[in-house]
UniProtKB/Swiss-Prot annotation:
GO biological process entries: ribosomal small subunit assembly; translation
Gene: rps2
Entry keyword set: Ribonucleoprotein, Ribosomal protein
Region (Disordered): 1-33
Name of the molecule in the record: Small ribosomal subunit protein uS2
Organism: Methanosarcina acetivorans (strain ATCC 35395 / DSM 2834 / JCM 12185 / C2A)
CC per GO annotation: cytosolic small ribosomal subunit
Comp. bias intervals (Basic and acidic residues): 1-13
Sequence similarity: Belongs to the universal ribosomal protein uS2 family.
Listed Gene3D superfamilies: Glucose-6-phosphate isomerase like protein, domain 1
A GO molecular function held by the record: structural constituent of ribosome
Length: 225
């Protein structure tokens, strides 16, 4: 993992500056004239930019501003760019060797749909320790790359991935630590609509890059209420 991380992060590097003041609008985080995977309004409506009232030093470079209520807001431009980079990375892997993991309730359905759309493996709900390291465990699997929904909730997965040297792409909120993550996608990883949008975009872009059919709507990825 230690050798893979710099290469992936170098490819995904984004320019960062000081955090804008409270008076600046979230849409200003998007570079003028650039084209995003979906409209900025769609990102905002899904709450992809909504972080938490905690931040880690690891995630500081992805923070756009701090609201007066103490909530950290993520930079939508960084989210869009990282989804592109992650999609390009994943498109180089055999889908059957990709593992998507989610212990979070609102992440399980989008992860399941991502797996269905691309033909990847999925481990949803409680992760059984040893599933990546112990061949005696039922459901043991040796992936080539892993996608996790939340580094905190999926901490055991990160630990095992690190021990076997498998690269990890992770959806990371402002409060996450990223020491065992190879490629960060900064996003709200707790919200129902945010998770569905990010997983839908990843699946759509990987399919596009691999020139394979993608016949799913965003609503197909949304966890039913």
């Amino acid at each position: 993992m230690a050798e893979a991380k710099p290469a992936l992060e170098k490819e995904a590097a984004v320019k960062t500056g000081s955090i804008p003041s409270e008076s600046e609008d979230e849409t200003a985080s998007h570079k003028e004239g650039s084209t995003s995977l979906v409209s900025i309004d769609e990102y905002l409506a899904a709450g992809v930019h909504i972080g938490t009232q905690q931040k880690t030093q690891d995630m500081m470079r992805f923070v756009y501003r701090v609201r007066t209520d103490g909530l950290y807001v993520l930079d939508i431009q960084s989210t869009d760019e990282r989804i592109r980079v992650a999609s390009k990375l994943l498109s180089h892997y055999d889908p059957a060797r990709i593992l998507v993991v989610s212990s979070r309730q609102y992440g399980q359905h989008p992860a399941r749909m991502f797996s269905r759309a691309l033909g990847t493996r999925a481990m949803l709900g409680r992760f059984i320790p040893g599933s990546l390291t112990n061949p005696q465990i039922h459901g043991f699997f040796e992936p080539d790359v892993i996608i996790v929904t939340d580094p905190a909730g999926d901490a055991q997965v990160l630990k095992e991935a690190s021990s076997i040297g498998v690269p990890v792409v992770a959806l990371c909120d402002t409060n996450n630590l990223t020491s065992n993550v190879d490629l960060v996608i900064p996003t709200n990883n707790k919200g129902r609509k945010a998770l569905s949008l990010v997983y839908w975009l990843l699946a759509r872009e990987v399919s596009r890059l691999n020139d394979t059919p993608f016949n799913y709507e965003l609503t197909d990825f949304e966890t039913p209420l």
